[in-house]
Design a protein with these regions (language model features):
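Charge-rich, low-complexity segments
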Residues: 1-80, 87, 91, 220, ...
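An acidic, glycine-/histidine-flanked metal-binding catalytic module
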Residues: 1-17, 150-252
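Short, charged low-complexity intrinsically disordered segments located at boundaries
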Residues: 52-63, 126-134, 225-237
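Long beta-strand-rich cores associated with HINT superfamily self-processing modules
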Residues: 74, 86-206
């Protein structure tokens, strides 16, 4: 049996471990996001063995020196356990970033978009907007029975709900095309969809800002009404021409 098949067989035995790790990390993320008032969907997965084998084969071909042992493959593949945070509002990315840095031990972080190689099609839009993190669980934040999960890496991806949906479509079409590489027309359509997603993100940011402003306005009205009612209850009254007048002495 060749090395890559040996690795896949070994990984299959550890699949439940990585799935449990993802469940634990996702649970932590859900809790801190909820307590901070960030609306998001949090999902997790252990990497599918079939997809993992395809990825390892691709990476092995591109390496200057092929994998020499199973340990090398484990060290090279960072997303055996993955957690995805799909934000309802893209404007929450910065706050989510700080929460992740507080909750996990960060090995590496990367912000997209980035341009790693010249594209075959010149994009008009900027592509994938997201933050990726490679992390470990913090030992002080898990139960004693869960400390064994602190030894494995987790990849966390944070993007808007819209961006994650577009990314899934693009990834499957580009990396797993049914027949050959995509044509310029297909790439142009993907680019067009990306533009619609980016426009949607702007709309979501405006929606969030409008909602926050509405809440602030309602709170301001409530506070003013409460302030006025309190004064009247205690015998204080506003005078004509003044927004509010406070008089000293006992209520009479």
């Amino acid at each position: 049996m060749d090395l890559i098949n040996q690795f896949i067989d070994n990984y299959k035995k550890k699949f439940n471990y990585y799935e449990s790790l993802g469940r634990l990390a996702a649970g932590q993320l859900e809790a801190v996001l909820r307590s901070s008032g960030i609306r998001a969907m949090v999902t997790y997965r252990a990497k599918n063995p079939g997809r993992l084998k395809s990825k390892v084969l691709r990476r092995n071909v591109k390496r200057p020196v092929p994998y020499r042992n199973i340990k090398e493959i484990y060290e090279d593949i960072a997303d055996l356990c993955g957690v995805r945070v799909s934000l309802y509002f893209p404007g929450d990315r910065l706050q989510a970033d700080q929460l992740i840095r507080d909750q996990f031990h960060i090995l590496e972080s990367k912000q997209f978009p980035e341009q790693s190689k010249p594209p075959t099609y010149h994009k008009r839009f900027s592509g994938y907007w997201a933050n990726h993190y490679r992390v470990y669980l913090r030992e002080e934040l898990v139960q004693p029975s869960e400390k064994r999960y602190c030894r494995a890496r987790i990849e966390i991806q944070v993007a808007s709900v819209l961006m994650h949906a577009w990314s899934e479509v693009e990834h499957d079409l580009i990396y797993k095309p049914l027949q050959g590489t995509l044509s310029k027309e297909e790439l142009a359509i993907l680019d067009e969809l990306n533009g619609l997603v980016l426009a949607g993100e702007i709309a979501l940011e405006r929606l969030q800002a409008a909602g926050n402003e509405r809440i602030r306005s309602k709170n301001a009205v409530f506070n003013n009404q409460y302030f006025s009612l309190s004064f009247q209850k205690e015998g204080y009254h506003s005078r004509p021409g003044l927004a509010c007048a406070v008089r000293s002495g006992p209520a009479g």
